């Protein structure tokens, strides 16, 4: 699969491959913390690694574009982060 491109909206990051939306992550900001509460990929993409790539692309977006600390409330996000501990620096203490 080609690279995922992230477009930021108000409290949502939407992921695209080319012009095709392949998922999104919803979050809410409270001060310097972003609570990541939902990720979604189309049913046809489930089980293909797209969800993992979505989470990683969104975590990179937070790292590169904000100073927020994250609180992953969606259970899929910590599952991905356990496999990619380099993103643990983003976690709220």
How would you describe each model-predicted region?
Residues 2-4:
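Extreme N-terminal starter segment of soluble prokaryotic enzymes
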Residues 7-9, 30:
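Structural motif
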Residues 33-43:
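Conserved acetyl-CoA binding element of GNAT-fold acetyltransferases
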């Amino acid at each position: 699969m080609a690279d995922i491109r992230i477009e930021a909206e108000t409290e949502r990051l939407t992921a695209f491959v080319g012009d095709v939306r392949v998922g999104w992550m919803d979050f809410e900001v409270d001060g310097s913390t972003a609570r990541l509460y939902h990720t979604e990929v189309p049913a046809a993409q489930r089980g293909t690694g797209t969800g993992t790539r979505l989470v990683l692309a969104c975590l990179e977006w937070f790292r590169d574009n904000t100073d927020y600390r994250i609180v992953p409330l969606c259970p899929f996000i910590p599952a991905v982060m356990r496999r990619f501990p380099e993103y643990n620096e983003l976690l709220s203490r």
